[in-house]
Amino acid sequence: MLEARDLYCERDERTLFRGLSFTVDAGEWVQVTGGNGAGKTTLLRLLTGLARPDGGEVYWQGEPLRRVRDSFHRSLLWIGHQPGIKTRLTARENLHFFHPGDGARLPEALAQAGLAGFEDVPVARLSAGQQRRVALARLWLTRAALWVLDEPFTAIDVNGVARLTRRMAAHTAQGGMVILTTHQPLPGAADTVRRLALTGGGAGL
């Protein structure tokens, strides 16, 4: 379980959120919503331990995140707004970098992400959407329980969004957890996703 307790965050003398508390249990996914500058990416960075809140605490499995960073990061898949891939490597080589023990599974993961036939193309030659798919192919390889995804559908077409949404639904059905930001609808998942709305100084579930 991931828990946020009474989080407070300020940026440039402006309160993004205060008194923000919620939990994400096994089998749940949460969509963080809010306007530009509401603090969506900032919240994800706090939840992953990439930044510290100005007040409050994040807990993982009942322990303060700052005390269990190693075990937490073994359980975490974080894909930020930037793909975080190496453009001089091929799609296959990028996945191998993150998942060196899964060589036999890489082609299937890339195919699931819509990159069949592009496995050995240097990422620098791929479109923005294809580069995003290289990063998202990790969803078919990772064993992490918690997925935190910042705008995963950027530059992804409708069919790709549907495929990725099904993968997230399968992950939560198996007891995984997903937290994501997106402005796009989640096809077929509207009834199962909790929404956390950041409203500037507060939030509502």
Curated annotation (Swiss-Prot):
Q: What is the membrane topology here?
A: Peripheral membrane protein
SMART domains under this entry? AAA
Pfam families xrefs:
ABC_tran
Sites where the protein binds ATP: 34-41
Q: What class of enzyme is it?
A: translocase
Q: Report any one BP term from Gene Ontology.
A: cytochrome complex assembly
Keyword match Disulfide bond: no
Q: Which domain of life is it from?
A: Bacteria
Q: Name one GO cellular component term.
A: plasma membrane
Per UniProt, residues of the ABC transporter domain are: 2-205
Any one GO MF annotation of this record: ATP binding
**For this protein, what reaction is catalysed?**
heme b(in) + ATP + H2O = heme b(out) + ADP + phosphate + H(+)
Q: Which family does it belong to?
A: Belongs to the ABC transporter superfamily. CcmA exporter (TC 3.A.1.107) family.
This protein's assembly is summarised as:
The complex is composed of two ATP-binding proteins (CcmA) and two transmembrane proteins (CcmB).
Q: What is this protein called?
A: Cytochrome c biogenesis ATP-binding export protein CcmA 1
* Primary gene name: ccmA1
